Amino acid sequence: MPPKPLFPNVFPGDGAPRKRRLALALLAVPGLVPAVSYAQLSGAAAQPQPLDSPWDLRLAPQLEDHPLKDGAKPAAFVIADHTSGTAEQDLAAKGSAELRRGDAVVKADAIHYDQDTDMADAYGQVKVINGGTSFAGPEAHLKIEANQGFMTAPKYHFNVTGGSGSAERVDMVDNERSVFVNGTYTACQCSTNPAWYIKGSRFDFDTGADEGTARNGVLFFQGVPIFASPWMTFPLSGERRSGLLPPTFSMNSSNGFELSLPYYFNIAPNRDLTLTPRIISRRGVMTEATFRYLSPSYSGTFTANYLPDDRLAHRNRYAIYWQHQQNFGGGFGGYVYYNKVSDNTYPEDLGSANQFINGTQTLYQQEAGLTYNNGPWSVLARYQHWQTLPPSIAPYSREPQLNVKYTKYNVGGFDFGAEADYSRFRITTADATEGDRIVFNPYISYGVYGPGYFVVPKVQYHFASYDLNYLSSTTPNSPKRFTESIPTVTFDTGLIFDRSVRLFGQDFIQTLEPRLYYVYTPYRDQSNAPLFDTAESDFGLAEIYQPNTFVGNDRIADANRITAGLTSRFIDPRTGDERARFVIAQQYYFADQRVTLNPGQAAVLARHSDLIVGAALKLGSGFMSETAFQYNQNNNQLVKSSVGFGYSPGERRVINVGYRYTRANTTLDNQPINQFLVSAQWPLTRRLYAIGRFNYDLAGDRVVDGLVGLQYDADCWALGVGVQRAANGINSSGQQNSSTRFMMQLTLKGLSTVDNGLVSAFRAGVPGYTPLPPPPPPMSRFSNYE
């Protein structure tokens, strides 16, 4: 018969030594303690497995809690070299004493336990373990089941979160809450000399709420105090909690030294607020606030920045950014994008003060809209306005716009649809044409697809009606009301051949894909139509199979041309990955294109377009390449070229080299683009990584932007530094301004992890950049099971 719990069987005078192996056997009695195992399984494998004999123990495949029945009390067990006590009352245990009751474990040189009050007094090398938290000290007094009591000079460790520290005294309130007096806290795993720690006069820990609070706290890093506060809160794990975020230090040539001290408010699981005082040495103190909200039917972000009495600009400066998405249900939705700055130089002076960016934003969108999407229907109603900063040219605003689209696929083999749009165009530029425009664009196509071919004829129609209420002085004789009707016919066809080939000792499937694309659009005079939303489209592989050489609805190019292209791919038959692709394409004109963007421009008189050639390679060992060329055969000139190579043999190892060239043209103010670019992320040691980006303008003999950074990844902290020099607007003489910025970001793992701009800059500047690894996941409370 299995032995019973120890306490009811201890009689007065029973002080004989007990063999430890016998006491340990008590703990193995089935049903008295939870079965344990370190394997974590699921499904049928996670169920206890019976053995052949009904009297054998069952296997427990994972650690489990077995709650007691209502009204039941947990059994208590004692292990010691010597025990003595009174039945049903108290017990004294000496010599490697150990008391267990429920989830609680007390170990000490000597333990006195009063069963009536559930009070345990432990002396000498005391260790208390309860609910995944362990305390070690010279003396402890506590109620076992309630986990209420105190310990002197404790050292503690939260098994689940990894936090630890020491104090003069700890008062245990319950299984989740504890109060430490004159103590320390760190999430570093090393027991001595942690890289960072918080020292305070009092700590309140709540493992259930995953939150710690320090009174009169001082944050130390490498033994040096870096921050102090009379009250601070912090998370005990990686979950979101209110508290201080890592400070950000930066320096640039216009603002001087800057220090940002963000504080995070975890208002609710779906709402938070980050409040950041930003000390700018040359301008003053700026306040930034970012509020985020999320619900099943809406979400958004609101950010406001305010700098009172800028010491350099001698005025108040501010910026507002608001993005909101709304789902009303039934396919209805809405949104708001509102961005505004106080003055024309705000982006240059303050917009990128603590973040690295390339260039300066000069267009700020102010838009609100309602949407509807249901099956083939798509509807947009919006009001759109722009705040435009020099030197940008103000675009037209839509005040308002109503856009309706209908699309249907494969109805008896036909695809058809239409787009209807009404817009009222307004602009802040003086002496510019304004008015209303209605557009209706229906289409129908019939596609025939086979295993190795496709044929898609398509007919589309463009109807536009203009009602202009103001004409620019440059076009005083243009009509205010007129319409346009322009049909377009396209015929798209291609073949697909494939074969098996073997190259460089590897098998591939090679395809050969010739394609012909014919477009016919008759000429219609469109010189009376203003350019509300229209520009010349780029010319490349993405645009060469499009019917219109313009983007927007104010110009439809006349066309009688055919595009001939040939694509060849090399595909890995085992994985389906495309390892190489080669493309060549060119347009051939049967008639001159007479429609131009602006009246008076010369018509396109060439017999064929520039030749487009492209290639993409994805080889083994992390090597890849993309190349594209645009070549003018008539002038024997290279119009555009783009060459890029990438090498990434492993994680956080990437090198990119690129070159791009664009011949001077009127769009570029007759200035060519001739730039060389290299970027990389590479480990210098096991913990130290270098990041760099260098963009050099060969034509202008200047650095467009450069970025150099280092990241160091330690066990419980990470440090990143970066220096960037970039173009930053245009000065009064029309020359490019350049600014230099320095930024440093310290991350204390286990305290808070946030990117204040440096990692985002590395990611944007280096394609393929991989951030430093996150902290390891929290341990199970059974990881240090005793």
Curated annotation (Swiss-Prot):
InterPro entries: LipoPS_assembly_LptD (IPR020889), LptD (IPR050218), LptD_C (IPR007543)
Region (Disordered): 767-786
Annotated GO CC locations: cell outer membrane; transporter complex
Highest taxon listed in the record's lineage: Bacteria
Biased composition (Pro residues): 770-779
Subcellular location: Cell outer membrane
Pfam families on file: LptD
Family note: Belongs to the LptD family.
Job of this protein: Together with LptE, is involved in the assembly of lipopolysaccharide (LPS) at the surface of the outer membrane.
Subunit text: Component of the lipopolysaccharide transport and assembly complex. Interacts with LptE and LptA.
Name of protein: LPS-assembly protein LptD
Species for this entry: Burkholderia cenocepacia (strain HI2424)
Source taxonomy: Bacteria, Pseudomonadati, Pseudomonadota, Betaproteobacteria, Burkholderiales
